[in-house]
Amino acid sequence: MDKRTCNSQDVEVRKGPWTMEEDLILINYIANHGEGVWNSLARSAGLKRTGKSCRLRWLNYLRPDVRRGNITPEEQLLIMELHAKWGNRWSKIAKHLPGRTDNEIKNYWRTRIQKHIKQADQNMKKPSKCEQNDQKAISTSQASTGPTDTIDSYSPSSYTENTNNNMENITFQGNFPTETNENIWSMEDLWSLQLLNDATN
């Protein structure tokens, strides 16, 4: 383990993972004396840890009301809503998610949601394979045929005859959508659904 000497009191300060014994000491001390000034709490409890280390261990892992388990899709939507409203104010967001810590929410945002946002941005910037193939086909056809070849071979009457003959045998069935916005999904709607889908899988 990493150990260093604190010059002011010559006490070895322990770093690294917490042991079960240290966890029990901290839990019992807080149960008997309550939370207080974390630096003095660490010394009084007999822990060779910094006050900050004790505070973070208690708040993020040992508190009885810390919620265990994965963040639910409902919590994810709430995190996204609140982040849109308040930005990276993790403590403020955590107050609206009982049992979740600001650190847990921040880590979830950075590893899951922000990652999806970056991927979506990259996908929006990259042309799809179909678009790339269309561009290749257009550039290939333009290179192989000169502009005079296509103009000379075009005949409006032959185009109309072929189209009319083919259209006689086609019948359309079903209702076609009208131009309303009620059935149109925004990119934000689709993105939220994708995140929910990923969270449940």
Swiss-Prot record:
Disruption phenotype: Down-regulation of ODO1 and numerous structural scent-related genes from both the shikimate and phenylpropanoid pathways (e.g. IGS, EGS, BSMT1, BSMT2, PAL1, PAL2, EPSPS, DAHPS, CS, CM1, ADT1 and PPA-AT) leading to reduced scent production (reduced emission of volatile phenylpropanoids, e.g. benzyl alcohol, benzylbenzoate, methylbenzoate, methylsalicylate, eugenol and isoeugenol). GO terms for molecular function: DNA-binding transcription factor activity; transcription cis-regulatory region binding. PROSITE patterns: HTH_MYB. One of its GO terms (biological process) is regulation of phenylpropanoid metabolic process. It comes from the Eukaryota. Expressed exclusively in flower organs. Accumulates mostly in flower limbs, to a lower extent in pistils and flower tubes, and, at low levels, in stamens. Residues 38-62, 90-113 bind DNA. This is MYB-like transcription factor EOBI. It comes from Petunia hybrida (Petunia). The lineage of its organism: Eukaryota, Viridiplantae, Streptophyta, Embryophyta, Tracheophyta.
